[in-house]
Curated annotation (Swiss-Prot):
It comes from Methanococcus aeolicus (strain ATCC BAA-1280 / DSM 17508 / OCM 812 / Nankai-3). It is an enzyme of class 6 (ligase). InterPro entries: ATP-dep_DNA_ligase, DNA_ligae_ATP-dep_bac/arc, DNA_ligase_ATP-dep, DNA_ligase_ATP-dep_C, DNA_ligase_ATP-dep_cent, DNA_ligase_ATP-dep_CS, DNA_ligase_ATP-dep_N, DNA_ligase_N_sf. Belongs to the ATP-dependent DNA ligase family. This is DNA ligase.
Amino acid sequence: MAILFKEVCDIFYKIESTTKRLEKMEYFIELIKMVENKKAPQDLKKICQIAVGRVFAEHENKELGIGPNILIDAIISTGINKKTIQNTINQTGDIGTALEQLGHNIKQTSLFQTPPTLEEVYTTLKKLSTIEGGQSQKKKIRHISSILIKSSPIEQRYLARLILEDMRIGMSIPTILGAFSKYYNQPKENLEKIYAVVNDIGLLAEKLAQRCDIYNDEELQLKIFRPIKPMLAQLIGSINDAIIEMGAPQFETKYDGARVQIHKKDNIVKIYSRKLEDITNSIPEIVEEVKNIEAQNLIIEGECVAMDKNGRPRPFQDILRRFRRKYNIDSIQSEINLKVYVFDILYYNNKSLIELPLIERRSILEKILTNKHNKLNISHKLTTDNEQKAREFYEWSLSIGHEGVMIKNPNAIYTPGSRVRTMYKFKPTLESLDVVITKAKMGMGKRKEWYGSFEIAVKDYENNLYTIGHVGSGLTEEELHNLTEQIKNITIEVINDEAIVEPKIVLEISYEEIQESDKYKCGYALRFPRVARIRTDKSIEDINSIEDIERIFDIQKGKGNL
């Protein structure tokens, strides 16, 4: 039996109406029960993805790519006056809420219009991502307006948000996994492990709804060409702290580059960025080297570094130039030389290795990679419990132009997508922060034509955003121009020269210190923040958390983090 989109939206409204995580879980369980009652296990996949503002699975690295301007044009095409919709958006601060309030003004094509099903909405939105070429914008507007016309105000509320991929109901992957754990009577930590490997909440949901054996189902195992989120490190206050905690850690050079995940099956190679983008065609020289590795199939992880003629790292932006280049690869390849320092192996000859300790994974890696690979090198490492030797290795890593050291527990397994306490990073300066732009204000003087000041935010456990300051320095005029063009495409509303934007642009911020402050809800503020880099290789999921801020604050005050 088909599930109506309105049935889902009614429960989404309940979820949005509470701030309590347990209540959100209980309401989500109502959706699971609806799926079971209607015998529609495939629909739980769609519900889960929609709940977190996605039409596609994370590993697919696809977006609808519809900005507020196209959505507003689609709304206008249904019969709502442009000034009316703009004023209502300004009053509510949300296109979805504004559309719900004005939904009665939409011209209905028929009094007997059939309400859209969940499947119909999902299929219509997936089509949007395939529309390209001439007249594509008009075609997208026509598709969006066709589904809006069939929808009730509550459906329009969530349709608008889903089109912008920002549902604002406070659902996160951990909350969904909590609901699964309770309803299907499965340990949450087991579900977290499976999700980390498949990187697809919809697939896991569908398998649970089908009552599959989730522990032995082949589709729920680590697979070649289905990238996973990388394991992330925490910050530590000193080398000695790490030795006290781990005994004899494995120290590795922290390279000044971009993380890559390399998949190989027979003679086919795919390389993914940290955001899980397929960058294979942009770095052909690395692809050719990977083909020469003697392995039937594998997944390895490393840091891609741009090198100058003296063997020292070039600026980070040069790597992004290579990753973004789609055409004339040969010319930029000769200009920007790349090398990948491989530090982990996750899969080898049809076997997942992520449950093996690091010391065993490293041993396998060292047998596979040899010095004959010019563009692929194993990361420099030192395993020791001697602080002086570790300090010398750290100083050497800095002397060759890199950022510091990674400190890893040799007995630790690989935990995809988690910021773990078995891997730390140690650098000579305070850790920079990855934040997302939430508002932008026009500049002054010669920069008055561009957005020049940005409100920036970090996240909490549930991925809610919290402002931590404003930043305006550190950007070139070219970067300001490019940012302004990007912001125009993701602007939700503009009030007094300040644009409220979709949280999609990630900045790396340096600062003098983190201060306690009651100015912002998170309780902290940045002193003298400055943009270090525009991180096009990162998404909102990669930004720092309030927990990270607290840890850095403790370290700068000499309290440590252990």
